[in-house]
Each structure stands twice: as C-alpha cells, then as structure tokens.
C-alpha cells in the first residue's frame, strides 16, 4: 500500500522539491508565492513560556480495563484538576493555539543511598537517572495535562524534548516556545475549525 501511494516520490529532498514543482502548470508563477511565504514564515517570532511545578515527577499510570470493558486511567482526573488550578493561579497567559515546541525537564528525587560525592554530581547534572519513569511517558503525562487548559490541543506540538535529571528538590520544569502567528493559512483554518467545533 505504501509503495502504491508513495513509491514514485524521491527519497532525496532536492529531488522531492523538483517532484512537487513538476506538478505546477507555470513554474515561475507558482514559485513566486513560495518565495514570499518562505520569507514570511522565517520572520515569525516565537514566544517563550516557562514554569516550574514543585511535585515529584510521575508518569501517568497505564490505562486499566474496568469490569464493563471500558478503559480508564486511575488518578488522571485529579492530575488534570490540579494542573487546571495551578495554571489559573500561577500563569496569566492566553491559551496557546499556534504551533509550538515543548520541553520537559523532570527532576527526580536524588536517591538516599547515593554517596555525597554522587549526590553533588547528580545535582549538577553529571549523573542522570536510568530508572522508571521513562522519559517519553513523563513528556506525554505533562503535555496531556496542559491540553485544554494551557494548550488548545497537544497536536499543536511540532517538536519536543524530554530530559530526566536528579535533584535534592524534585520538580518539573516545562517550557513552551510558540509562534506568535500561524505558519500557514492551511494550519490556521484547521485550528479555527477545531475551535468552532469545541464551542
């Protein structure tokens, strides 16, 4: 199925661009708006929102199956409520509804059985956690908790980094970098439609 749909598309990027432009009836007329849009998109400014939540980082529990066959995540509603209150009380920002980048730094408690030398090295980031929770589960947990509260939809996240650290002061540091405007009319229409659908 993949081969039928995408087999003729080149693997090399320059060849793919040539392939896309080969569909144009008048290449010069098509390329002019492409150049204009490229310049506009490159000039889009990004805003940064950074905040710290003083909790021990935990991944969401795996979904469990109830007796009636439905799936649920134990404690998910409490987590969502906590974060909703946290954002209302701490952050005075409009909901993010443009493409964004998400960075999650999870500081796990430094183990008590570490030597003082290792505790010091862990605090400055030279010794890192290689235990549960997994880095991707932490990122998913904390990006999900922003959905509908700080972030219109986590589908807006176009790039993300999740890192695990040790610290004597456990916490979660979240950074969002988001566009001041949309990168394209195409994406703007998609989000506008989703917003109208949720009203």
Q: What are these language model-derived features?
A:
Residues 1-199:
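Acidic, proline/glycine-enriched N-terminal capping motif
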């Amino acid at each position: 199925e993949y081969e039928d749909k995408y087999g003729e598309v080149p693997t090399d990027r320059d060849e793919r661009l040539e392939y896309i432009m080969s569909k144009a009836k008048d290449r010069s007329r098509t390329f002019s708006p492409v150049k204009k849009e490229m310049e506009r998109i490159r000039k889009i400014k990004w805003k940064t929102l950074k905040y710290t939540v003083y909790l021990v980082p935990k991944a969401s529990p795996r979904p469990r199956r109830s007796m009636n066959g439905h799936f649920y995540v134990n404690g998910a509603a409490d987590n969502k409520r906590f974060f909703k209150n946290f954002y209302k009380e701490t952050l005075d920002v409009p909901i993010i509804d443009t493409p964004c980048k998400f960075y999650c730094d999870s500081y796990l408690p430094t183990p008590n059985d570490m030597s003082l030398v290792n505790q010091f090295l862990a605090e400055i980031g030279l010794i890192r956690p290689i235990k549960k929770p997994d880095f991707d589960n932490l990122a998913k947990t904390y990006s999900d908790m922003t959905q509908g509260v700080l972030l219109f939809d986590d589908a807006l996240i176009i790039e993300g980094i999740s890192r695990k650290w040790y610290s004597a002061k456990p916490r979660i540091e979240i950074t969002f970098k988001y566009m001041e405007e949309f990168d394209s009319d195409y994406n703007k229409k998609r989000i506008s439609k989703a917003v109208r659908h949720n009203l």
